[in-house]
Amino acid sequence: MSLKEKTQSLFANAFGYPATHTIQAPGRVNLIGEHTDYNDGFVLPCAIDYQTVISCAPRDDRKVRVMAADYENQLDEFSLDAPIVAHENYQWANYVRGVVKHLQLRNNSFGGVDMVISGNVPQGAGLSSSASLEVAVGTVLQQLYHLPLDGAQIALNGQEAENQFVGCNCGIMDQLISALGKKDHALLIDCRSLGTKAVSMPKGVAVVIINSNFKRTLVGSEYNTRREQCETGARFFQQPALRDVTIEEFNAVAHELDPIVAKHVRHILTENARTVEAASALEQGDLKRMGELMAESHASMRDDFEITVPQIDTLVEIVKAVIGDKGGVRMTGGGFGGCIVALIPEELVPAVQQAVAEQYEAKTGIKETFYVCKPSQGAGQC
């Protein structure tokens, strides 16, 4: 049974009438451009065919009823006429409440709604299950009540909800790609202007995501440290963000910076340049060059930005040994564990899967999780 069928059937059973709409919003993977988003730089993600699906209908009153199919059909109810505060017990409900609350601040011309939510974006894998939920809820209200909001506004609303209501400090990339993703394309995003450019993906290439299943422990504290060091670097160059510093300017005075800060700044500058070039390589179908850029990105994250772990490096090496120069592989996400992403000709996927199954657990003691994805369409009706 598809997520659409599941949520529609649950909706009819729970609420006693049929849903009028079913909306989906996808998760995402970032192909290249790591830690560049909060430096006003460039990222190159694609939406994936794992999504949050919501069957829904408008109500003729001011009540919101939400059922979470993936959490034993827990039900949350709240009113649009009372202050929206955090739910004491259901963390999932706070993503919904946060989106609704922040949407009221943007455009309060919507009424009540019934929703049943289900999703298959793996949680805790860095594939943006939370952003896909936020964008799905925003799209539900936009579609049901014909709100004059575009995908970028729905994305910004989701980011605000996560930052201010849920209390997690994320960039804009995850929500933006979920809202604006395009089938068979990646999206080059300028994180300063929020401008986007669709980049066609070569035919016959699979997007493979492999979760190392190494439990991330350092990610919060180390992420914040990296962010502060990048801000220190921007101040040193008297620029608003590292996006405004050229590699030539950096090389001329790198010796004056703290050596650790200098290495971390260098990663951001080189990664921005790689990301822009990667968009061109992909568009031209040059998988060999894309692979080189992904390899350089991984080396930079490992040696300059220092955010990989041995388990991730091992996974990358296993995949690289199989694909050679026919594709690319690198760590993706915040670092200190999580996933790797690989662009692989479809005919090589079984060989990669076999090599990883045979070697990764033997070398690390951890069993990986393997996902084969397609670049998918952003949020909308399904």
Swiss-Prot record:
This protein's UniProt keywords: ATP-binding, Carbohydrate metabolism, Cytoplasm, Galactose metabolism, Kinase, Magnesium, Metal-binding, Nucleotide-binding, Transferase
Top-rank EC class of the record's enzyme: transferase
Binding site for Mg(2+): 130, 162
Residues annotated for substrate binding in this entry: 34-37, 223
Pathway assignment: Carbohydrate metabolism; galactose metabolism
UniProt site (Transition state stabilizer): 28
Enzyme Commission identifier(s): 2.7.1.6
GO molecular function annotations of the record: ATP binding; galactokinase activity; magnesium ion binding
Main subcellular localisation: cytoplasm
Compartments it resides in: Cytoplasm
GO cellular component: cytosol
Entry's Gene Ontology BP terms: galactose metabolic process
UniProt key word Hydrolase: no
Active site: 174
Positions of ATP binding: 124-130
Disulfide feature: none
Pfam families: GalKase_gal_bdg (PF10509), GHMP_kinases_C (PF08544), GHMP_kinases_N (PF00288)
InterPro entries from the UniProt entry: Galactokinase, Galactokinase_bac, Galactokinase_CS, GalKase_N, GHMP_kinase_C_dom, GHMP_kinase_C_sf, GHMP_kinase_N_dom, GHMP_knse_ATP-bd_CS
Enzymatic reactions: alpha-D-galactose + ATP = alpha-D-galactose 1-phosphate + ADP + H(+)
NCBIfam families referenced in this protein's UniProt entry, alphabetically: gal_kin, PRK05101.1
Its biological purpose: Catalyzes the transfer of the gamma-phosphate of ATP to D-galactose to form alpha-D-galactose-1-phosphate (Gal-1-P).
Protein family: Belongs to the GHMP kinase family. GalK subfamily.
Protein name: Galactokinase
Organism name: Shigella dysenteriae serotype 1 (strain Sd197)
Lineage: Bacteria, Pseudomonadati, Pseudomonadota, Gammaproteobacteria, Enterobacterales
